[in-house]
Amino acid sequence: MQKLPVKQRLLLGFTLFSMFFGAGNLIFPPHLGAQAGSNFWPAFAGFAVSAIGLPVAGVVAVARAGGFDQLASRVHPKFSLVFTILVYLSIGPCLAIPRTASTSFEMLVPLVGGGRGLQLGYSIVFFAAAFLVALHPEKLTDRLGRVLCPALIALIFVLFAGCLLHPVAAQYSPPAAAYARLPAFEGILGGYQTMDALAGLNFGAVLALNIQALGVTEENAIRQNTIRAGFLAGGLLLVIYAMLGHVGALTGAAAPDCTTGAEVLSALASALFGRAGQLLLAAIFLIACFNTCVGLISCVGQYFHTLLPRIPYPALAGFFAAASMLISNIGLAGIIRLSTPVLGALYPAAIVLIALSFLPKAFQKRSVYVCTVALTAVQSVLAALPFTAAFVTALPLGSYGFGWVVPAAAGLLVGFLFP
């Protein structure tokens, strides 16, 4: 099997990490730390299971199946087409890509001021730069893994080191009510809400292009290097999340009025470095959002290029970048209202697909996939609809957002027993 040098393996892991690590990944751990307080570490263990374990499992599942569409086609080819299109649009131009610009701009407002004109100019420059980098998805290892990812990690470490050398509080605060009884379970819920498993299903194709660009052509070697990159990215996420969660727990004790992860980080940066801290935080958010934007434009453009091969990849990448720029300026709130329920309906089915792929061979038959995914999807769609949500909440675990677990288990049993 073709092998890559250790340095190139590390670059692949850095590249995948940089695509995963967006604004939401910056915000969730500090908020978890501030809320969990003295119960931070058990809460973080639960958070890691769902916020790191699921995305890495998604990367591995797609690599083993030979692609996201191949994994979804185990249900049915038509399901695969519809499901993958919905997932790519939901995490792409309909939600995640526009939010990268709007979120990073919000962190710059305290430094440069606001205004529609300034936001428009910023978004044009932001998406133009992201488009230029995404023009060559096979070179993301050089652009993201070699340059931007190390810069991002270094800036986060500056914030963490400042907190270690000059802690803003002597100890963690008492936990909030939700984290007082079952901190690990609350951590699992928080990690689940990142919905990063969807990204794990999508980034594998772009990573495969970068592996091929390094001279690896054997399918098995591409698969193994993708899986290694997934585990390395997961390890980096674990370390960075722990750092951010720790500083969040200390900052929550010093500034208990902070209600969001962004407020926690802003309070910490200001306490440590003053105005320079706000500049540091803005740079962290800018790089994180830019990396994710490039990764999403690349994977969405690449998928639709395979679906519509007559349309060149640069044209598709440019279209998605331009559409995301417009949405981030004129219609993001409405798009979020529409896309969030769609994501909520898609996410359980994606998790079930990932989980099924790791089951023994006896479960690898179409009836298992059809029954399990179908019952999961029905429950998830009903939970996303406002007029049926109350009924679905009454199901076991429904009030926690896991009402799909029992239908999925029932579907698994029926599908397994089906001849």
Language-model segment annotations:
Residues L135-C163, S339-I351, V370-V378:
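Membrane-interface loop-to-helix entry segments
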Residues H31, K78-G113, C289-T306:
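Hydrophobic transmembrane alpha-helices that form the core helical bundles
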